């Protein structure tokens, strides 16, 4: 039984909502993947706040129509597509996709769209090599903490140095 117009409109609305919440979209050719393998991909993406959505290209076209952030996605809408919509941990989700592809050797990445720009395969791989947001924040916090510690030591050193100088001067005066 075919989908009704109302059903299709609900799907388009759902896709629009998912796209509004997403930072990046990766388009995969899922031809040849089993249901078990698709479930495996979805479970790998859950930890990174990514969603794998299989939908007709025509419905995705309607969802991105008029949205300048996602318009370039249209060039990837041919064949059998699974759309991985990534909300937060972009690097982690891309790593999960690449790990899945390495394990199954069945799906290919057709392309990705990040901040309104199509990415090449090499750019997608670069994103996967980036540390997670938490790791970057920890590095920044560590660097800031190091600077604060150095400032505190420097500020504390001035009175200590002055006190040592005065003590040495008073000891010389007494002798």
Swiss-Prot record:
GO terms for molecular function: large ribosomal subunit rRNA binding. Keywords: Ribonucleoprotein, Ribosomal protein, RNA-binding, rRNA-binding. The keyword Transmembrane helix does not apply. One of its GO terms (cellular component) is ribonucleoprotein complex. CDD domains: Ribosomal_L10. GO terms for biological process: translation. Coiled coil: none annotated. It comes from the Bacteria. Forms part of the ribosomal stalk, playing a central role in the interaction of the ribosome with GTP-bound translation factors. This is Large ribosomal subunit protein uL10. It comes from Prochlorococcus marinus (strain AS9601). The lineage of its organism: Bacteria, Bacillati, Cyanobacteriota, Cyanophyceae, Synechococcales. The gene is rplJ.
